[in-house]
Swiss-Prot record:
Subunit structure: F-type ATPases have 2 components, F(1) - the catalytic core - and F(0) - the membrane proton channel. F(1) has five subunits: alpha(3), beta(3), gamma(1), delta(1), epsilon(1). F(0) has three main subunits: a(1), b(2) and c(10-14). The alpha and beta chains form an alternating ring which encloses part of the gamma chain. F(1) is attached to F(0) by a central stalk formed by the gamma and epsilon chains, while a peripheral stalk is formed by the delta and b chains.
Name the record gives this protein: ATP synthase subunit b
Subcellular location: Cell membrane
Chief subcellular location: membrane
Role this protein plays: F(1)F(0) ATP synthase produces ATP from ADP in the presence of a proton or sodium gradient. F-type ATPases consist of two structural domains, F(1) containing the extramembraneous catalytic core and F(0) containing the membrane proton channel, linked together by a central stalk and a peripheral stalk. During catalysis, ATP synthesis in the catalytic domain of F(1) is coupled via a rotary mechanism of the central stalk subunits to proton translocation. Component of the F(0) channel, it forms part of the peripheral stalk, linking F(1) to F(0).
GO cellular component, one term: proton-transporting ATP synthase complex
Similarity comment text for this entry: Belongs to the ATPase B chain family.
Listed transmembrane segments: 11-31
Name of the gene this protein is made from: atpF
C-alpha cells in the first residue's frame, strides 16, 4: 500500500509552503504587471467600443423613430391635402354644373321668348295679310255687285267663287 508521505510527495514543511506562497505572490505581481493591466486595457477598450456601438445604435434607432414620425406626419399632411383637393374639385365641379344649368335655362328661356315673339310677329303678319286680302276681296265683291244686280243666290256663288280662288292662290 501507499504510504502518506509518498502520496503527498514528501513531508510538509513551512519553508516549502512559504517559498511556494512567495513564488505565487511574485507570479501574481508579474501577471498583474505584464498580463493583467494589458488584458484589463483591452477589456476596457472593448467595453468602451461596445458602449459606443450601443450608443450609436440607440442614436440610430432614435433617428429612425424621428424619421418615421416625420414620414407619418408628411403622409398625413399629404392625405389631408389630397382630401382638400378632392373636396375643392368636387365643389368646383358642382359650381360649374350649376353655372352650366343656369346658362342652359337662360338660353332656353331666351329661345322660348324669341319663338314667342316670332310666333306673335308671324301671327300679326298673317292677320295683316288676311285683312289686306279680305279688304281687296270685299272691294272686288262690292264692285261686282255694283256692276251686276245680283240676286242672293248669285251673290253667294260669287263670294264662294272668290273664296275658292283665294284658297288656290295660297
Amino acid at each position: 500500500m501507499l504510504q502518506p508521505h509518498l502520496v503527498i510527495g514528501s513531508a510538509f514543511t513551512f519553508g516549502d509552503a512559504f517559498f511556494t506562497l512567495f513564488a505565487f505572490a511574485i507570479l501574481l505581481v508579474l501577471i498583474r504587471i505584464y498580463a493583467w493591466k494589458p488584458l484589463m486595457g483591452v477589456m476596457k477598450e472593448r467595453e468602451e467600443h461596445i458602449g459606443s456601438e450601443i450608443d450609436a445604435a440607440e442614436e440610430s434607432r432614435a433617428q429612425a423613430e424621428q424619421l418615421l414620425a416625420e414620414q407619418k406626419s408628411v403622409l398625413q399632411q399629404a392625405r389631408v391635402e389630397s382630401q382638400t383637393m378632392i373636396e375643392n374639385a368636387k365643389q368646383l365641379g358642382e359650381k360649374e354644373r350649376e353655372e352650366i344649368v343656369k346658362t342652359a335655362r337662360r338660353e332656353s328661356e331666351r329661345i322660348k321668348e324669341e319663338a314667342k315673339a316670332d310666333i306673335a310677329r308671324e301671327k300679326e303678319d298673317a292677320i295683316s295679310a288676311l285683312r289686306e286680302q279680305v279688304g281687296s276681296l270685299s272691294v272686288l265683291i262690292a264692285s261686282k255687285v255694283i256692276e251686276k244686280n245680283l240676286d242672293e243666290k248669285e251673290q253667294s256663288n260669287l263670294i264662294q267663287d272668290y273664296i275658292e280662288r283665294l284658297g288656290d292662290d295660297k
